[in-house]
Regions:
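Short amphipathic alpha-helices within nucleic acid-binding modules
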Residues: 79-80, 145-161
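Acidic, glycine-rich flexible loop segments
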Residues: 128, 133-142, 146, 150
């Protein structure tokens, strides 16, 4: 294959990936917000959660964002309908994620960072809650857009699976970050990789 064709193939693949991975949509409209709120009410989301989510939707930028989650697992987890016998907290979360992972990956949403707690919280200010310094895990989850997140949360399949997450978690804090930036953005990494491949192919053809 000639270098020109190699560059063309790489360019087509990259443009396709960039177009899928990047949010080009406008911010959510008031009509969309009302529609998602109605869907959340229909699938049984708590009123206080819906109110918080409404505010998040109304401040939509149209861009991608991440949610920072810190989690303290419940051991043993609560027993709910459909839970595996003698399951631990991680097994309950895995059952919850059986729906979430396909829904996330199909929308270019994915974990950016996952880590286990190395110690209790080292710095707490303005917080006086018992055991607030005890956490098991931190997760940074990237979402392509708020519209994608709402499509997942308003899916009736999510409501049924959410019980497994509630059963497995003692306490959690989750808050969104937007704007945000990471040096390991897959669009940047893939662009650099394709440049290396393209120039390496050119060098091989010259030799």
């Amino acid at each position: 294959m000639t270098p020109a064709r190699v560059w063309l193939v790489l360019a087509v693949i990259y443009v396709a990936f960039f177009s899928w991975y990047t949010s080009f949509g406008d911010p959510l409209t008031p009509e969309e917000v009302d529609g998602y709120v109605a869907e959340l009410e229909r699938v049984g989301q708590p009123p206080e959660a819906i109110e918080a989510i409404r505010g998040f939707m109304e401040s939509d930028t149209g861009d991608d964002f991440v949610i920072l989650n810190i989690v303290d697992s419940r051991e043993p987890p609560l027993v709910v309908e459909g839970s595996p016998p003698a399951a631990n907290a991680q097994e309950m979360v895995d059952r919850y994620m059986e729906f979430m992972y396909p829904a996330l990956f199909a929308r270019a949403c994915h974990p950016v960072m996952v880590g286990s707690a190395a110690h209790r919280a080292l710095d707490l200010m303005g917080i006086e809650v018992e055991d607030i310094d005890i956490w098991d895990q931190g997760v940074l989850m990237r979402y392509r857009s708020r519209r994608d997140l709402m499509d997942i949360l308003s899916n009736p399949a999510f409501a049924g699976r959410h019980e497994f997450k509630v059963a497995a978690i003692e306490k959690t804090i989750a808050f969104p970050l937007d704007p945000w930036f990471q040096l390991g953005d897959p669009r940047l990494v893939l662009a650099l990789l394709f440049l290396v491949i393209g120039f390496a192919w050119q060098a091989l053809r010259r030799n």
